[in-house]
Every structure is written in C-alpha cells, then in structure tokens.
Amino acid sequence: QAKVEMLDNLLDIEVAYSLLKGGAEDNKKDPIDINYEKLKTKIEVVDKTTKEAEIILQYVKNTHAATHNTYTLVVEEIFKIVREGEYQKYRPFQDLPNRQLLWHGSRATNYAGILSQGLRIAPPEAPVTGYMFGK
C-alpha cells in the first residue's frame, strides 16, 4: 500500500513537472503567467458576499460533522475554476435541475494535474486515507 501511495505521489509530481517544463518560453513574460497559461484554466476569486459564496459557506457549515469537534473550519477564499473546453461539455446538461456541490480535498502535489487535466476517479489500489465520504 505504501509503494502504491508513493507511485501515486510520483505521478502527481511528474504531471506538475511536465507542466512547468513545457516548451520554448517567451522570456518577456513573467514565469508565473507562463505557468498559469499552461494550466488552460481560468481561476477567479469569488466575492464572499455573492449568493454563490453564501451557498458554499452554508454547505461548509452544514457538513462539518459533530464528530469533528476538535477544530473549526474557516473558509479563507473561494475560487471559481473554468477549465478550457469544459463549458461545451456541460452545455447540454445546464438546464437539468438535479445539481450537487461536491467537496474535494487533495494534496498540494495533485492540484496542477487536477487543474490541467480535470478531476479523475481514483484507481481501486489508491490509498484510502482521507476519504471521509468514501471513493
């Protein structure tokens, strides 16, 4: 199990490294801007006074289990993520009424891959640590 977890971590690091490495770069651009563009993702901060933010904050409050009483949750920022090409995939379903907010926690090494390639279903051999609601 430990070896599978190590391989999973290495794969996440490889994805992040491949994004950072990239190809020929424009030396006039800021490296942060170059790497942000490689994600092919638009990231916006959501104003906490909006209805969208209020719903998310209420969900956080409602899903903080009574068994997790040794800490309190504080939402520091809320981000809206728009991945390139995702809207076209979503468009045929946008008028359906059955929507759900889903929570996803992940290691920092996973975020470059999640943002650039989307969230993928964990393979059966992946470690189960941290799955509060199952896989």
UniProtKB/Swiss-Prot annotation:
Indicate the residues that form the catalytic site: 135
Location relative to the cell:
Chromosome; Nucleus; Nucleus, Nucleolus; Cytoplasm, Cytosol
Q: Tell me which Gene3D superfamilies the record gives.
A: 3.90.228.10, Poly(ADP-ribose) polymerase, regulatory domain
Pfam families the UniProt entry points to:
PARP
Keyword Cytoplasm applies: yes
Name the principal localization, coarsely classed.
nucleus
Q: Post-translational modification, briefly?
A: Poly-ADP-ribosylated on serine, glutamate and aspartate residues by autocatalysis. Auto-ADP-ribosylation on serine takes place following interaction with HPF1. Auto poly-ADP-ribosylation on serine residues promotes its dissociation from chromatin.
GO terms (BP aspect): ATP generation from poly-ADP-D-ribose; DNA ADP-ribosylation; double-strand break repair; innate immune response; negative regulation of innate immune response; negative regulation of transcription by RNA polymerase II; positive regulation of double-strand break repair via homologous recombination; protein auto-ADP-ribosylation
Q: What class of enzyme is it?
A: transferase
Please give the activity regulation comment for this entry. Answer: ADP-ribosyltransferase activity is regulated via an allosteric activation mechanism. In absence of activation signal, parp1 is autoinhibited by the PARP alpha-helical domain (also named HD region), which prevents effective NAD(+)-binding. Activity is highly stimulated by signals, such as DNA strand breaks. Binding to damaged DNA unfolds the PARP alpha-helical domain, relieving autoinhibition.
**What positions does the entry give for NAD(+) binding?**
104-106, 113, 120
Reading the lineage from the top rank, the first entry is Eukaryota
Q: Which molecular function GO terms apply here? A: damaged DNA binding; NAD+ poly-ADP-ribosyltransferase activity; NAD+-protein mono-ADP-ribosyltransferase activity; NAD+-protein-aspartate ADP-ribosyltransferase activity; NAD+-protein-glutamate ADP-ribosyltransferase activity; NAD+-protein-histidine ADP-ribosyltransferase activity; NAD+-protein-serine ADP-ribosyltransferase activity; NAD+-protein-tyrosine ADP-ribosyltransferase activity
User: What is the protein's known function?
Assistant: Poly-ADP-ribosyltransferase that mediates poly-ADP-ribosylation of proteins and plays a key role in DNA repair. Mediates glutamate, aspartate, serine, histidine or tyrosine ADP-ribosylation of proteins: the ADP-D-ribosyl group of NAD(+) is transferred to the acceptor carboxyl group of target residues and further ADP-ribosyl groups are transferred to the 2'-position of the terminal adenosine moiety, building up a polymer with an average chain length of 20-30 units. Serine ADP-ribosylation of proteins constitutes the primary form of ADP-ribosylation of proteins in response to DNA damage.
Quaternary structure, from the entry: Homodimer; PARP-type zinc-fingers from separate parp1 molecules form a dimer module that specifically recognizes DNA strand breaks.
Query: Record's domain comment?
Result: The two PARP-type zinc-fingers (also named Zn1 and Zn2) specifically recognize DNA strand breaks: PARP-type zinc-finger 1 binds PARP-type zinc-finger 2 from a separate parp1 molecule to form a dimeric module that specifically recognizes DNA strand breaks.
Designated name of the protein:
Poly [ADP-ribose] polymerase 1
Primary gene name: parp1
